[in-house]
Amino acid sequence: MPPKKNVVEEKPALIGRLGTNLKVGILGLPNVGKSTFFNVLTKSEAQAENFPFCTIDPNESRVAVQDDRFDWLVNHYKPASKVPAFLNVTDIAGLVKGASEGQGLGNAFLSHVSACDALFHLCRAFDDDDVTHVEGEVDPVRDLEIISNELFAKDLQFIDGPLDKVEKLFTRANDKTKKIEYDTLVRVKKCLEEKKPVRQELWNEKEIEILNKHLFLTAKPIVYLVNLSEKDYIRKKNKWLPKIKAWIDTNDAGAVLIPFSGAFELKLLDMPEDERQKYLKEQGVTSNLDKIVHTGYKALQLEYFFTSGEDEVKAWTIQVGTPAPKAAGRIHTDFEKGFIMAEVMKVADLIELGDEAKCKAGGKYRQQGKTYIVQDGDVIFFKFNAGAGLQAKKK
């Protein structure tokens, strides 16, 4: 049976800014370990004091995406320059109950959330008498509810403006071109009233275009991070983890949950490399920071391809689904304008076979045209019509 024509595929929405310079914000209540996490993640020294709102202006940094494939390419080509992919991370000040109504630092915090493209939602599952909890007792499920409710409340406040505007045009001015926009925003409001995140709804391409005009907070992808004590992280047990997982399954099905320990990571950060490796081996654990970075990168729908040679090995960030000419444009706009072809090797093939010559001999070095969709880990050699004094090839 032939496929139906003009059927718009429904898929999870990629809502928000399109591009490669996207960032993940670290979100949570005060004193749950956000600044400590940011410090160990970026190896920076952002202030981390034991009182609410010590992080007023968001600290921003970028974190290298650790990749064994990139390390292999660097070792193989021994380039003069090496540039990995990076994840942009922002430490947002602690959000408190009532922020949507101006409590704490209120709407200033929510504007920082709005400026991010995805979120690390960090909750605390450790007891420490020296680190007070803004709500008194430690209860990460309650904390998840507080943050979730504030995001829903802010979206509900926001939706009325654009919905009223398009409703006037559609129903009163009889502007039929506004029907899709009106129907989409009505559906968004229904989701919010039912406490269903916008990201959990299925949207078609046209609806996504409309949603991308707005910055709904509940549309942003979320990775849930649970900050454990060093002891619980090492023994891989904590009484709150099953309850947190149950909350996520009910309220944000399919979202990723990653346990980590700020205290554990901070301890590793202060150790020399040989001592660190010995300690990890003795405890039978590994750091989860690389996993967190990779998960945040994927949450932004980002991936990267490599250009490699003796001059430079570089990972170029693109959005998933990028065609070859647009990927070439990440290097220089002339590469996109004068695109001829992309000569592509899979990095896995290159690692397995050992060098480019063997990839070519084994039929693993392919010429791809304008319709080729670049895949994560492609090693690409672009050919283009030279312009603006550039060389005819870039690798």
Curated annotation (Swiss-Prot):
Mg(2+) binds at residues 35, 55. Monomer. ATP binds at residues 31-36, 228. GO terms for molecular function: ATP binding; ATP hydrolysis activity; GTP binding; metal ion binding; ribosomal large subunit binding. This is Obg-like ATPase 1. One of its GO terms (biological process) is thermotaxis. Hydrolyzes ATP, and can also hydrolyze GTP with lower efficiency. Has lower affinity for GTP. Plays a role in regulating starvation-induced thermotaxis responses in AFD thermosensory neurons. Belongs to the TRAFAC class OBG-HflX-like GTPase superfamily. OBG GTPase family. YchF/OLA1 subfamily. Expressed in the nervous system, pharyngeal muscles and intestine (at protein level). HAMAP family: YchF_OLA1_ATPase. It is found in: Cytoplasm. Residues 22-280 form the OBG-type G domain. Residues 301-384 form the TGS domain. It comes from the Eukaryota. CDD domains: TGS_YchF_OLA1, YchF. Its cofactor is Mg(2+). PANTHER family: OBG GTPASE FAMILY, OBG-LIKE ATPASE 1. One of its GO terms (cellular component) is cytoplasm. Keywords: ATP-binding, Cytoplasm, Hydrolase, Magnesium, Metal-binding, Nucleotide-binding.
